[in-house]
């Protein structure tokens, strides 16, 4: 029986078309999967980057708060604060020693806050990506650091007002103010600002360190 080469060619051509279409569909599926995997990898990589950014900002702010609370104020720091107060129009010469000291100490805390400004700006820069990737709880923990700084500055503002008060109630308030500014003196003392920083740092580490460290296990 003679072979119909024309029909055979049409047959194989049809098979080739089907196989070619199947290959295209398979390639499309593989390509789509590869793109999805690539996107997932990019998202995961971005999540790790943001986790590192948030933790770094938190560590910087925590260290900045510790720096602001340093109990030792060298003469140069006190003199610089006094000079700045005079430049701002506040004349401390002639004030009672207690009032003058209180104003200068207040100035020291504001100068320290200015010195560490970039560390707190790093926290503000991390808030938006933290909200996108990790939610409101992470943002609340981040905000604890600038809140602690602002609370300290509010307590510093009260130093001049409390410098000449001797009532028992005001003396108790003075103790609280100084704990706000310098931290606790004894382990059993209360330190609301310090505890808020510890709580925030613990929450961030519990949430984000596993994400950052996951790269070491890959």
Language model: regions and residue ranges:
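Terminal, low-complexity, charged helical segments
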Residues: 2-8, 60, 67, 136
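An amphipathic alpha-helical interaction surface
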Residues: 89-218
């Amino acid at each position: 029986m003679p072979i119909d080469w024309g029909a055979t060619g049409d047959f194989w051509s049809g098979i080739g078309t089907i196989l070619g279409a199947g290959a295209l569909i398979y390639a499309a599926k593989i390509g789509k999967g590869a793109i999805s995997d690539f996107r997932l990898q990019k998202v995961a990589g971005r999540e790790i980057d943001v986790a590192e950014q948030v933790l770094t900002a938190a560590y910087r702010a925590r260290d900045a708060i510790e720096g602001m609370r340093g109990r030792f104020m060298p003469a140069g720091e006190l003199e610089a604060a006094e000079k700045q107060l005079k430049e701002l129009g506040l004349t401390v010469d002639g004030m009672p020693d207690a009032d003058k000291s209180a104003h200068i100490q207040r100035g020291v805390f504001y100068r320290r806050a200015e010195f560490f400004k970039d560390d707190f700006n790093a926290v503000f820069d991390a808030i938006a990506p933290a909200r996108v990737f990790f939610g409101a709880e992470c943002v609340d923990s981040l905000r604890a650091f600038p809140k602690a700084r602002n609370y300290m500055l509010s307590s510093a503002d009260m130093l001049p007002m409390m410098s000449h008060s001797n009532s028992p109630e005001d003396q108790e308030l003075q103790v609280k103010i100084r704990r706000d500014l310098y931290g606790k003196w004894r382990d059993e003392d209360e330190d609301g600002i310090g505890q808020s920083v510890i709580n925030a740092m613990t929450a961030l580490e519990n949430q984000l360190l596993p994400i950052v460290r996951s790269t070491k296990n890959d």
